[in-house]
């Protein structure tokens, strides 16, 4: 019953550990997240996610809704970690040196959750992701790193468009 996922549930350390375990698991993370969304679990556990489900992005860079774009970002990060792809050898090497991959995945999930709220979506998402990471019981250092990654994610977008203008796989 989705109604059981309330503030008490979301603040329970057992469920926080289970969510982090999902992020670190060997299984197809984007498929798991999509299934959670389909069942309403993701929106119940991360209420901010509910606000972007089906939300169109009206710009030159995005062709997917915010939620679908988010799943593609997570999928691409996961594939970059698991498989060395031609042209992305350095990225594959670097992502595999990240000691806490869940930090990157959480930043990926939250990077656009501030859209549609008015104001700078990066700043809104940074605050939201910081609160979420703290709720999960993550250290202050990890929570602040997630928040910083969300706040600065447009730098990587600018870099990507400058260096890989034909790569529209997540937009």
What are these model-derived regions, one by one?
Residues 160-166:
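Conserved small/polar residues in nucleotide/adenosyl-binding loops
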Residues 4-121:
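Acidic/His-rich, divalent-metal-binding segments that scaffold phosphate/diphosphate chemistry
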